[in-house]
Amino acid sequence: MGETIRFGVSIDEKLLESFDGLIEEKGYMNRSEAIRDLIRAALVELKWEVGDEETVGTVTLVYDHHVRDLSDKLTEQQHAHHDKVISALHVHLDAHNCLEVLVVRGKAREVKKIADELIGVKGVKHGKLVMTTTGEELH
C-alpha cells in the first residue's frame, strides 16, 4: 500500500446525507473507507469489462438431480474446464434439488463463458455468476 493522500470533494448536501446514511447502514467507520471501497469496486468492474484481467468468481447452480443426465452434463462441463474450476461444493437442498457452488479462476471473459455454459445446461433451474478480484492489484 502506498502513501495516503488527503483530498477534498465537493458534493450536493442531499447526496452527502444519503451517502452518510449508506455509510451508517453498511457499518463503515468513516467516509474515507466507504469512498475507498467505491473506488476499488469501480476499478474491479472496469477490469471485468476489458476481459483480459485475472479474476475469480463463484457460479451458483440450483437443479433437480432427478433430471436425466443433468448431473453428468454439469460434471462434464466442469472437467472440460478443469484448469479453471478450482473448487466445487455440492449441497442437497431437499429430496430433489441440489445447490452447487463452483469457484472459477481465469481471465474475466473465460470465467463468464464457463458460467454461461453451466447456467445454460438444460435443466438448471437457476444460476448466477458472482465475480470478484484476486486482490493482487488492489491497495
From Swiss-Prot:
Provide the species name.
Geobacter sulfurreducens (strain ATCC 51573 / DSM 12127 / PCA)
Q: Which family does it belong to?
A: Belongs to the transcriptional regulatory CopG/NikR family.
Does the entry feature the keyword Iron, yes or no? no
Q: Can you tell me where the transmembrane regions are?
A: none
Q: What does this protein do?
A: Transcriptional regulator.
| This protein's name | Putative nickel-responsive regulator
A Pfam family annotated for this chain is RHH_1
Q: Which cofactor does it need?
A: Ni(2+)
The cofactor note reads: Binds 1 nickel ion per subunit.
